[in-house]
Amino acid sequence: MNEKVLVFDMDGTIANLYGVDGWLESLRAYDSSPYEKAMPLYDMDMFNSILHIIKSKGWRIVVTSWLSKGSTPIYDKAVRKAKREWLKKWGVPYDEIHLVKYGTPKHRVTKYPFQVLVDDNEEVRNAWHGRTIDANKNIIHELIKIVTDEF
């Protein structure tokens, strides 16, 4: 049986980075704190409960997210740390994480036979080589379909 993988973006998908006051100015100033300050876009108790059920059905949970557009080795390290800490703080049960250079084609990062991408970026979803879930809509409904085997 092929492994089933659910791949999540972070910013604008599960973390409300764009809701942090001054987020863009901060990132342009090589300040990673907006990644730490971002609030979840969903009730995380419900979200994480659904992910645990999905995992119990044999799915792997992968986070694939871009680093900031502005980049230095030290800043990239701070962004990686902030994103990992955000996932830990909110208890997201992931199996694998890929924090990659801004603009990296996400369809080249994970290579599983059956994988579903959850992302807010239409261009990224269009380049994906499998099923996608539009994170601009309520993803909880789509995740419940996976839980009930209706996906």
Where in the sequence are the language-model features?
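Short beta->alpha connector loops
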Residues: 45, 100-104, 122
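Acidic, Mg2+-coordinating phosphoryl-transfer loop and its flanking beta/alpha structural elements
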Residues: 115-151
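Conserved beta-strand termini and adjacent loop/short-helix elements that scaffold enzyme active sites
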Residues: 64, 99-102, 135
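Flexible, charged surface loops at secondary-structure boundaries
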Residues: 1-2, 55-57, 109-113
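Short catalytic/ligand-binding loop motif for oxyanion handling, primarily in non-cytosolic enzymes
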Residues: 15-18, 70-74, 105-109, 124-127, ...
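Donor nucleotide-activated moiety binding/catalytic core segment of transferases
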Residues: 94-115
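Alpha-helical substrate-recognition element adjacent to the catalytic core
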Residues: 5-89, 94
